[in-house]
Amino acid sequence: MDRYAEQLHLTMLAKAPEIILFAYNQLLGVKLSPRFRTPWQGMGTSFNYDEMTAPIRQKDGTSIEPTTMARIADVVLKQTDKLIGKLGNPIGIKSYKPFHVAGDDFLQNYLGMIGLPMDIRPVFPKDQQVVLLTAQAAQAPELMTDIRKQLQSGRDVVITSGLLKAIPEKIAEIVELRCTDLKALVNDFGRYGQAGRDLLIPQVQYYTNDAWEVVSAGRPLTGGVSGYPILLRAPYAAGNLYVLTIPDDMGNLYDFPAKALNEIRRIMSRDMDIYLEAPSKVGLFVYDNKTLVVENFNDEPVEVRIVTDDEVTRLENLENGDILAPLPAEPVQSRRPVTPKN
């Protein structure tokens, strides 16, 4: 039941112009039951089961006892409606997906669940510091021209290992990188921490000193023999082309250690001037009026840091007015991108 409430909440946060309630027959036909009360109730979650099932007091002094799941939609829509009027238009990391294409299917959904807000566009974005290209962009006729212009202007492109695999000859016009048929089992991300399980990834190969590993993984990486790039940087002209290695099971992105995710978020979020430091399954919604929403999809509380630029001196909770003071900045561990000099 919490998941249904969550879907309504997220749809409103996305500022969808219309909402269709799924399975309306179930809303009317399924009776409320104590078994719907989840273990995480009472942990400060935005959805409160006990308040939802409480009697509804009428103007004439009488009360109505909620009996069906329709009450969920009533509570969530009213609750979120008080907030969304304070939020601007959603913004995110722009990802180029031409019409009528396939490849890296649903990847943006998984990236959103690791704190990378996605904004999918059918035309190559020409006004962004960072553009994400998945295998969906492989068939775009002007793709390499657009990539060159982006890099030559001093801006960055992030491609997935899936796109590198799909168009190796085209990418080779810019950088000498290859996504091979070889696989690697990894679980150790070195200074960025350990994964909770073994992850199967494609092996991305490159020439040493022509490209640099920003995030690496091995089994083990620390004290081991081999390491493999998770996030690889290859300078070109005045910009950088990054390769983000996607596990064979996209759900394994959720198993990346938090510090590795933090570095990926930092590099990909330049256009928003804000990013999360958090474990996976924490979503970030950013809006164009300097507002944001952080959503925890885990079954337990997690610690989250919001990293902003120097212009932001405090954060205000839009629901209760609480002020969050900034914490001391922590040093960035990775090599920062270097702009090549001619």
Indicate residue ranges for each PLM-predicted region.
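Hydrophobic targeting/anchoring helices
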Residues: 1-106, 232, 244-245, 253-254, ...
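A conserved amphipathic helix/loop scaffold
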Residues: 108-109, 118, 122, 134-342
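Short acidic/histidine-rich motifs immediately flanking catalytic phosphotransfer sites
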Residues: 126-131
